[in-house]
């Protein structure tokens, strides 16, 4: 059980890191990216992006919103 938990925690950390790096590139600021990751987001059903990164599906939703922001599209 402990190995599964540590593998899950590692996967969560990796997803958060990847999405945060994407946000940093888009916002061109570490502080702005972290702020965005920690705030409720209407486009994500008022969820905090960082909380959605606990699953692959949630991280994909966050990436889609970031991509829309990057390309100036509505979400």
Question: Language-model features: where?
Answer:
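Non-transmembrane "mature" sequence context
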Residues: 1-75
